């Protein structure tokens, strides 16, 4: 049997020293006027993170850092609540795999009305999502290895069953 496939991963990647200074411009280009900056508690306390947040000061930036190293659904729910309460219209996910995964899922869930688990990466469950309810997301990886910045999925633990 001959297999044919097409692969399209239209993720724009910027890299190089000092590129974080472009965050405000990247947000504006993505239509984000009030970004929610999502990171983990350890990174939130570092000068490089403060500098990244300060680069967004001209925008209505908020910060969310209530993320466990192996994120759980309550981390996502808390982030979605902060996003909605602050009227944020996009996400800047900053950190390693956990922060990037939570940031992506917060952006995905921003305008959804169904529970997060209705969108597991199983079969065609993704078709249940309202595409208009997905906020734009900008991922800034601070580690190498997970590739979360270019993937569509986020690994989140369901607290009731302890499954991912």
For each predicted feature, which ranges?
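N-terminal small/polar loop signature for handling phosphorylated ligands or for N-terminal nucleophile
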Residues: 44-115
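A general structural motif
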Residues: 32-34, 88, 134
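An N-terminal, well-structured beta->alpha segment
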Residues: 1-64
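A glycine/threonine-rich phosphate-anchoring loop and its flanking beta-alpha core
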Residues: 21, 111-164
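Conserved active-site and cofactor/substrate-binding residues in soluble primary-metabolism enzymes
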Residues: 18, 30, 47, 51, ...
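Conserved beta-strand elements of the Class I
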Residues: 36-37, 90-92, 138
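Structural motif
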Residues: 27, 83, 129-130
């Amino acid at each position: 049997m001959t297999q044919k496939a097409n692969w399209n991963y239209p993720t724009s990647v910027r890299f190089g020293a000092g590129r974080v200074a472009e965050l405000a411009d990247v947000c504006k280009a993505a239509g984000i006027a009030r970004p929610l900056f999502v990171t983990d508690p350890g990174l939130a306390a570092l000068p490089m993170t403060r500098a990244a947040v300060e680069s967004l000061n001209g925008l209505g930036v908020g910060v969310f850092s209530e993320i466990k190293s192996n994120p759980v659904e309550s981390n996502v729910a808390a982030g979605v609540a902060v996003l909605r309460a602050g009227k944020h219209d996009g996400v800047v996910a900053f950190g390693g795999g956990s922060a990037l995964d939570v940031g992506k899922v917060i952006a995905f869930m921003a305008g959804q009305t169904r529970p997060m688990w209705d969108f597991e990466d199983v079969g065609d469950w993704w078709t249940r999502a309202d595409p208009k309810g997905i906020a734009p997301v900008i991922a800034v990886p601070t580690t190498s290895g997970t590739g979360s910045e270019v993937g569509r999925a986020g690994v989140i633990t369901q607290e009731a069953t302890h499954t991912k």
